[in-house]
């Protein structure tokens, strides 16, 4: 394991878990055309994967984070070097296979963005268990654990439930941002779940075409004990916050996006930083909304600027409370959508 920088004992520590990290490569081309050889611009390399992105933004915002992740091969070595250069503390579980790459191609002529995501390496059972062992030790002294991103090929879909069980035994709040089977197999133990509408739709098995349906689905997860709090990111339309007793709508922050990468991770990071400061959920989600907007100003997967986050935070309107009578839930039962 590697940890190039010590954490500040005076600050609440945030542990992030990234089971499928990536070396993010961003480049540009005039026009994307099939079959032709396209001459691209100089590449930009960034350390990536959900939890790693969260740790980078926590660091930018002045929080104290340690990124925990498996890594291997030359891509894993470069990813670690980039994190070290950024001053983000990390702990690595060495694996035999090589860390994956992901590619973002910006088409200059149209301002369109193309994102290509590789599946990632398979982890042995021993490597998977070592990740949990490292988390178990780290969670005991953490203020929050953030598990974010996809699971690698071959890892059981209930892996994040095992993460939740570890956090529950450590009395450490878990913030989860994932999709697919990793999300669908969560049954309990999550403090805050961040989901897009698509991810929420997959989780409950309904189309969720309207805001009342989206809020009702979020409350369904809370009522079933799968999470205590649900934040639904709505992209350009803002966000929703659901707790056991209330719901709030957060408006989007007007701005012109440069990139569509990383806004969700920035939102999760800023929410966690806010909570680690002792802020209310509402204030923390306002900060998350601001960080998500600030992330859209950066090229590729570069971290957002703290000044932009603070500026957008000041611009962000207070949320609107949504009455319970506006989101009565009539679920469409999908036996494959929930455990």
UniProtKB/Swiss-Prot annotation:
Pathway(s) it belongs to: Carbohydrate degradation; glycolysis; D-glyceraldehyde 3-phosphate and glycerone phosphate from D-glucose: step 3/4
Covalent cross-link (Isoglutamyl lysine isopeptide (Lys-Gln) (interchain with Q-Cter in protein Pup)), residues: 283
Record InterPro entries: Carboh/pur_kinase_PfkB_CS, PfkB_dom, Ribokinase-like, Tagatose/fructose_Pkinase
Cofactor note: The magnesium does not function as an allosteric effector but is essential for glycolytic reaction.
Alphabetically ordered keywords of this record: Acetylation, ATP-binding, Glycolysis, Isopeptide bond, Kinase, Magnesium, Metal-binding, Nucleotide-binding, Potassium, Transferase, Ubl conjugation
Annotated positions binding substrate: 22-24, 37-39, 49-53, 100-102, 150, 265
Catalytic activity: beta-D-fructose 6-phosphate + ATP = beta-D-fructose 1,6-bisphosphate + ADP + H(+); D-tagatofuranose 6-phosphate + ATP = D-tagatofuranose 1,6-bisphosphate + ADP + H(+)
Binding sites annotated in the UniProt record for K(+): 259, 261, 295, 298, 300, 302
Signal peptide boundaries: none
Function in brief: Catalyzes the phosphorylation of D-fructose 6-phosphate to fructose 1,6-bisphosphate by ATP, the first committing step of glycolysis. Can also catalyze the phosphorylation of tagatose-6-phosphate. The catalytic efficiency with tagatose-6-phosphate is about 1.8 times lower than that with fructose 6-phosphate. Can use phosphate donors other than ATP (GTP and ITP), with lower efficiency. In addition, can catalyze the reverse gluconeogenic reaction, albeit with low efficiency. May support and maintain basic glycolysis and metabolic fluxes during conditions inhibiting PfkA.
Similarity-based family: Belongs to the carbohydrate kinase PfkB family.
Something else known: Activity of PfkB is tenfold lower than that of PfkA. Activity with tagatose-6-phosphate suggests that PfkA and/or PfkB may substitute for tagatose-6-phosphate kinase and further support glycolysis.
Protein name, per record: ATP-dependent 6-phosphofructokinase isozyme 2
Organism encoding this protein: Mycobacterium tuberculosis (strain ATCC 25618 / H37Rv)
């Amino acid at each position: 394991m590697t940890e190039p920088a010590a954490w500040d004992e005076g600050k609440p520590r945030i542990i992030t878990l990234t089971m499928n990290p990536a070396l993010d490569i961003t480049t540009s081309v005039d026009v994307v055309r099939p079959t032709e050889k396209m001459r691209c611009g100089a590449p930009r390399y960034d350390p990536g994967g959900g939890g790693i992105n969260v740790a980078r933004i926590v660091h930018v915002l002045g929080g104290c984070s340690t990124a925990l992740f498996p890594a291997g091969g030359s891509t894993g070595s470069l990813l670690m070097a980039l994190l070290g250069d950024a001053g983000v503390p990390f702990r690595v579980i060495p694996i035999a296979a090589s860390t994956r790459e992901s590619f973002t191609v910006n088409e200059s002529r149209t301002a369109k963005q193309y994102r290509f995501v590789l599946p990632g390496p398979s982890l042995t059972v021993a490597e998977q268990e070592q990740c949990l062992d490292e988390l178990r030790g780290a969670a005991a002294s953490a203020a929050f654990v953030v598990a974010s991103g996809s699971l690698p090929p071959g890892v059981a879909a209930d892996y994040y439930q095992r993460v939740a069980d570890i956090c529950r035994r450590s009395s450490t709040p878990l913030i989860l941002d994932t999709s697919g089977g990793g999300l669908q197999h969560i049954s309990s133990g999550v403090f805050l779940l961040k989901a897009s509408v698509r991810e929420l739709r997959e989780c409950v098995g309904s189309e969720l075409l309207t805001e009342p349906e989206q809020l009702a689905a979020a409350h369904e997860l809370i009522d079933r004990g799968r999470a205590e709090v649900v934040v639904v990111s709505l992209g350009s339309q803002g966000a929703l916050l659901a707790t056991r007793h209330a719901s709030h709508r957060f408006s989007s922050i007007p701005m012109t996006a440069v990139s569509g990468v990383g806004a969700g991770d920035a939102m999760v990071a800023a929410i966690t930083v806010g909570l680690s400061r002792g802020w209310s959920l509402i204030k923390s989600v306002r900060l998350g909304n601001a960080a998500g907007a600030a992330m859209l100003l950066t090229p590729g997967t570069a971290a957002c600027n703290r000044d932009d986050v603070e500026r957008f935070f000041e611009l962000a309107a207070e949320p609107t409370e949504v009455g319970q009578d506006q989101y009565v839930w009539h679920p469409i039962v999908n036996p494959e959508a929930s455990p």
